[in-house]
Amino acid sequence: MRFVNESAKTVMECTYDYMGRRHTRKVSVNGTVSSYLRYMYRGYLQIAAIDAVSGAFRWFLFWDPTQPEAARPLAIRKDGTWYAYGWDLTKNVTEIFGKAGYLRTVYTYTPYGEVAAEGDVTQPIQWSSEYNDEELGLVYYNYRHLNPHDGRWISRDPI
């Protein structure tokens, strides 16, 4: 699948596996590849992103093992450091905590999920504990994207 943001001159190309999960995500800006990730899953839970060129882990997610389905992420390991998530009752990530419980990033949202972050830790899981495709301004819900600007899905629900 290919997404194009003409105003930002950004192209995102994704491949999917036989279960419909996103397998790779390559982002190019002005024709130069800026990010090329390969994803790992536990069932349908995205648990890690690996740099497809170097093979290095970009991040690793720890989900609540007591939940049968994806509920909320508990922590993320990024750049060799663990960070803990704080969320509200609708599963939106609202805070990222660093070592010793220090608040590192705070997230606020519009009613449909446009995000504003204040802090120094960037990470992909945000609105509704789903993946934020920052380059496109869309929220990835495993099978389709939500446009948080107007609260609409960009495609039909796959059957």
Question: How would you name each of these model-derived features?
Answer:
Residues 12-21, 36-45, 58-71, 83-91, ...:
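Aromatic-rich beta-strand edge motifs centered on tyrosine
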Residues 6-9, 30-34, 53-56, 66-70, ...:
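Short, solvent-exposed loop/turn segments that connect beta-strands within catalytic domains
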Residues 4, 16, 29, 50, ...:
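Intrinsic-disorder/low-complexity regions
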Residues 158-159:
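Gly/Pro-rich loop segments of beta-rich domains
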Residues 27-31, 150:
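A periodicity- and composition-biased signal for non-globular, repetitive helical segments
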Residues 75-143, 148-150, 154:
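A motif-centric feature for acidic-aromatic and gly/ser/thr-rich catalytic loops and repeats
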Residues 1-5, 11-15, 21-26, 44-52, ...:
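Beta-strand elements of repeat-based all-beta scaffolds
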